[in-house]
Amino acid sequence: MNYQPTPEDRFTFGLWTVGWEGRDPFGDATRTALDPVESVRRLAELGAHGVTFHDDDLIPFGSSDSERYEHVKRFRQALDDTGMKVPMATTNLFTHPVFKDGGFTANDRDVRRYALRKTIRNIDLAVELGAETYVAWGGREGAESGGAKDVRDALDRMKEAFDLLGEYVTSQGYDIRFAIEPKPNEPRGDILLPTVGHALAFIERLERPELYGVNPEVGHEQMAGLNFPHGIAQALWAGKLFHIDLNGQNGIKYDQDLRFGAGDLRAAFWLVDLLESAGYSGPRHFDFKPPRTEDFDGVWASAAGCMRNYLILKERAAAFRADPEVQEALRASRLDELARPTAADGLQALLDDRSAFEEFDVDAAAARGMAFERLDQLAMDHLLGARGAAA
């Protein structure tokens, strides 16, 4: 297989990813600032489909209207020159100290109103640039101490904010949807809507739930010790996987933001297998940080590695699914039986069926092997390249 990405693969990168200067809580920047125009051009050369941005990635905070116009003009020209797209945008409601207690759920009402206006302004720009999805990551929406935040009131304010944003895009006739990005902690001690499940439940309480989905990130769910492919499967099942952030993470620790495939490789394999077999058609968006040890050559090598790893895993997953021995193993593990309704004949037929309870041989059923180990080893063989690739 050719592992050279093309725009048809729909790989996208946030400007903040390759543009990360390497500054962390313990050390200053190790790289200089990267011009967004340079990011667009270099990513296009690597075969990416598009870029995404926070408002402050593209337009420095506090810019005048004329400065804002020039920043957008240069960026738009770079998009036109390269054919790169902007499928998604988002708002930075976490860097400036005004957001130290959050944006949509800050205890201060004036901060909440400012956060909404800042978001609405960038939604206008996102639509202007062709974005179809608007991500909301509430990194500062949370608390470090129990008395600091009435979570019920905070959720009311969160609902109010999203309902207002939904009203705004509807009134403007914008063809854009929102994707809530969960995270359990960091930078706040505890963040509201910490997992995919929390976000899905919250969405059902909104006035226009059809406008809202989720943007799960590999590392965020794994920080909570959760199975990321399972979370994605539930989002797909709910029809709410509006966007996805791909990166690498090694277990329950700080948000590592490694390049995709550099963390839990088995989970990455099952994730790609799921996305490809489920027919997910959205961008494959990389939200990672090139390590601060790297110069700019390393930045671009890291970005290229994200795409290459995805394509390798896509090939391995396709080979796994096409392998006749795997197909036989899937049947032996009775995956086809799981796909059959348990009681398509209805409740009464179930109650009347003596073989379902009175005559059910629990000992015989308990003695059946599931053959999962053989199936899993076949997956490992494909992941590790010990079996042939798909034709």
Swiss-Prot record:
Swiss-Prot/TrEMBL cofactor(s): Mg(2+)
Entry binding sites for Mg(2+) 2: E217, H220, D255, D257
Listed InterPro entries: Xyl_isomerase-like_sf (IPR036237), Xyl_isomerase-like_TIM-brl (IPR013022), XylA_actinobac (IPR013453), Xylose_isomerase (IPR001998)
GO molecular function, one term: magnesium ion binding
EC number assigned by the record: 5.3.1.5
Subcellular localization, as worded in the UniProt entry: Cytoplasm
GO BP term, pick one: D-xylose metabolic process
GO cellular component annotations of the record: cytoplasm
Pfam families per record: AP_endonuc_2
Active site: H54, D57
Binding site for Mg(2+) 1: E181, E217, D245, D287
Cofactor note: Binds 2 magnesium ions per subunit.
Keywords in alphabetical order: Carbohydrate metabolism, Cytoplasm, Isomerase, Magnesium, Metal-binding, Xylose metabolism
Catalysed reactions, as listed in the record: alpha-D-xylose = alpha-D-xylulofuranose
Annotated HAMAP family: Xylose_isom_A (MF_00455)
Function, in words: Involved in D-xylose catabolism.
NCBIfam families listed in its UniProt record: xylA_Arthro
Subunit structure: Homotetramer.
Record family assignment: Belongs to the xylose isomerase family.
PANTHER family associated with the record: PTHR48408, XYLOSE ISOMERASE (PTHR48408:SF1)
The name this protein goes by in its record: Xylose isomerase
